[in-house]
């Protein structure tokens, strides 16, 4: 919590960059997702000033135009977090991301990362986890239907099946596609399905404990 406070304290040497280049949008998206997933541990204990500084910082990122691929979800999940905490929201960023990701579904649990399909781990790094988390909030706010949320979850479950089958008996997995060095996120959809306790019946949670982390 002290680190989070320092992250938006102008006088702290640990103050995060929210103003230079596009990268802060990516970083802020994962931070916003963490706030969504663990509000009682990470968001609610923060003091009022720190919360307001994060809200201001997140809103300042609206100036950045996202790349036309999975990056649409970065802006969308930031706005979704703002919606969750009762702030004014740029709905267009949320709806555009959801619309395009849905259009880019190619079947069998896989989304295309933009108009052209790329065989890589971005379905795990970004697409499934963020889309499901976004739909969870939109469902709570009655902006999307239960059916839309459930469809996204079912697709993530199907993708987790592919992910589990790529893990070798010794815990290694094939490195392919761009950003293969982001190995800690290579099975995020699989771990999220395990966390939600909706793994396919033939995948036992204990089998995942020895998977790469």
Where are these regions (language model features)?
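Conserved small/polar residues in nucleotide/adenosyl-binding loops
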Residues: 209-213
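Aromatic-lined, polymer-binding surfaces characteristic
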Residues: 1-156, 164-191
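Loop/turn-rich, solvent-exposed surfaces of beta-rich toroidal or solenoidal domains
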Residues: 193-196
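Glycine-rich phosphate/ribose-binding loops and adjacent secondary-structure elements
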Residues: 160
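Catalytic-core region of carbohydrate-active enzymes that cleave or remodel glycosidic bonds
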Residues: 199-208
